[in-house]
């Protein structure tokens, strides 16, 4: 199973912790690099306007058919119509279908113009970057897109996006399809709501700009992250809108939040805690802030709860602006093994 990287991976365009996404491709055991002796690869993209009408029709028809299967909860037929690596590890997509079935039932769909991606070469491409559409002197235009996908075997692929409306909420469903003879098989399944905690990308953008104008850059940065995440249907897609938001966010990025593997140290109750991640998370109708920190052992729940509480209070003391942006804070103590212990504290209870 492979996870598609964002076009601006250092910024984490999509918070992978919120919601679940599945994209499966046949992967090599080792990462492939390019060296003077490595055969060249070609990677090309055709927009809907560039491809043959028969190809576009086939892609749109396949996407509609797979949506209908998803709305019925027909995971068996979806699995039969998947590429072999996906079918052999189908639990993630099956869970996603079940999770989204209620939102799909009775909904109406509109298929966006699809993209056709081609990888030529003798072996899988470790990092395929597809530039789709017309680019200007400053980069992307309103009709362009960039996709970055890892470990793609030579083949033809499509990214086909559906707007799903009329169900529980407005959302997108993105299929990655791979050509197999005359068929287009399922290679990836991504469902994503257009809102977080009841708000869309525009709302988060406006709030981020308000925070930035008030020099609340920590809040601005985190809200920009949500705006960017909501502005593209999938992590591995970049558009003019996401690029512009990214540039705005960079101007507000604080230097004292943990990013790109760095840590932030806070002191609480005579102990130093190493914070590794801080990010927003929707919990029901609330937007909370999650903070992860390093812990040696989380087997003692009572002690871990006390340490979580200490970290939460220390974080909000250090950054009091969080009080106006988030309903609560979730602290997660994480062992080196990855096992963790989490607890939530409402902002009104943080004294």
Pin down the residues of each PLM region:
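N-terminal secretory signal peptides that target proteins for export/translocation
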Residues: 1-19
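Bacterial N-terminal signal peptides
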Residues: 22-35
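Short beta-strand edge/turn micro-motifs at domain boundaries
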Residues: 43, 152, 156-199, 280-303, ...
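Short solvent-exposed beta->alpha transition segments
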Residues: 46-54, 60-61, 76-143, 228-258
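Acidic, serine/threonine- and glycine-rich low-complexity intrinsically disordered segments
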Residues: 193-273
């Amino acid at each position: 199973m492979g996870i598609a990287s964002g076009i601006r991976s250092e910024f984490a365009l999509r918070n992978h912790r919120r919601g679940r996404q599945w994209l499966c491709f046949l992967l090599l055991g080792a990462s492939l690099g390019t060296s003077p002796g490595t055969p060249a690869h070609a990677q090309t993209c055709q927009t809907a306007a560039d491809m043959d009408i028969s190809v576009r029709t086939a892609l749109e028809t396949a996407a509609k058919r797979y949506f209908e299967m998803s709305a019925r909860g027909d995971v068996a037929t979806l699995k039969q119509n998947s590429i072999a690596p996906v079918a052999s590890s189908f639990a993630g997509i099956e869970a996603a279908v079940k999770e989204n079935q209620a939102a799909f039932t009775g909904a109406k769909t509109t298929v966006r113009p699809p993209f056709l991606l081609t990888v030529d070469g003798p072996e899988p491409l470790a990092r395929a970057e597809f530039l789709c559409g017309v680019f200007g002197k400053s980069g992307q235009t309103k009709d362009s897109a960039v996709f970055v996908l890892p470990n793609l075997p030579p083949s033809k692929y499509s990214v086909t996006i559906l707007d799903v409306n009329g169900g529980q909420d407005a959302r997108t469903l993105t299929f990655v399809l791979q050509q197999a003879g005359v068929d287009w098989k399922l290679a990836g399944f991504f469902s994503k709501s257009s809102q977080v905690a009841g708000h869309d990308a525009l709302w988060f953008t406006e709030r981020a700009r308000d925070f930035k104008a008030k020099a609340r850059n920590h809040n601005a940065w985190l809200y920009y992250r949500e705006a960017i995440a909501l502005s593209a249907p999938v992590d591995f897609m970049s558009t003019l809108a996401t690029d512009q938001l990214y540039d705005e966010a960079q101007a507000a990025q604080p230097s004292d939040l943990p990013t790109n593997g760095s840590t932030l140290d806070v002191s609480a109750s005579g102990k130093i805690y190493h914070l590794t991640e801080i990010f927003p998370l929707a919990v029901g109708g609330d937007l909370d802030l999650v903070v992860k920190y390093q812990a040696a052992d989380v087997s003692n729940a009572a002690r871990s709860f006390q340490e979580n509480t200490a970290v939460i209070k220390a974080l909000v003391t250090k950054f009091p602006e969080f009080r106006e942006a988030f309903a609560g804070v979730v602290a997660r103590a994480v062992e080196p093994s990855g096992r963790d212990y989490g607890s939530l504290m409402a902002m009104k209870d943080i004294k």
